Amino acid sequence: AFQKASPTLLSFFTGNRLISVSAVAALSAPLAEFSVGSKLVVVSGDSTLGRLLKGIGLDLSGTSLVAYDGLAQAKITPGGLLAALGIPVAADIGVGELNTLLAGRSVALGDLLNAIVTLAGQNSLLSSNIALLQAIQAKLGLTNLMVQLGSLADGPRGLFAQIISPGGTGASALNVGVGALDLLFTSIGVATSQHAVDTGVSLDVLGLLTATVKAAVIEPPSIAIGGIGAQAYNAQVRSFITLKTGSLLSGLIKIDLPLVVDAVTGVGKVIDMCTPALQAPTTGKDRAKFQV
């Protein structure tokens, strides 16, 4: 609060006026940022991004991805990402309006990858992005891959899950730090969803049967930002397995059997946060509680 004595405007009125100004700051509701993933087997010489991509059926073993490990510690805000993509956002945007804006915008995967590495201060990865994008396109046999930025309750999933923030604002969600590597991987997952990838797996069972495998991301992974009730999903991967008669049985019997196998979907949900009971005992930092 600030107070100052001010002289009267008219000299024949005696005394002074006391002017008081008070500033009231309203704290935004707390928000968490999180994603859901699978624990993957670590192979010597493999990169973090390479392991993540294998989890959604993209084996890019012939492409060097180790340099992307430098993104693991970098944080990017959604607001900064939208600005880098040339998408204007009103300063007073509400959470519902922000969800609608994000869900209604799609950007080219290449542009998104470049914006992420640039904001993370890793400009040296811009050339690596070209090789990465070409490798993904070669696997899918497609070009012009697009990424939907947001999600609505009953619509397709985008890069960011639907933001749920009781009492929060769109501006606070735009300023939450999100892991750059998570953004990169999730962007690729969204862009490649619904497209089958040849895994390169082909088995011959003693000349009796042969099996070929393709995989597709039916539902992409997502990154969640929000308060209690916010949810994030891992990628739901569907495998297409074709069994055919091998060389030893080809003259006796013919088998051509397609099989579809779905991986279990993982969901993470914030059920409590920033309460005294959840504070870290040694540092006192606020924490969130999740249901997976």
Specify the residue positions occupied by each region the protein language model found.
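Short, conserved structural patches
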Residues: 1-55, 206-210, 216-221, 225-292
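Charged, amphipathic alpha-helical linkers/stalks
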Residues: 28-120
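Charged, long alpha-helical assembly modules
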Residues: 119-260, 264
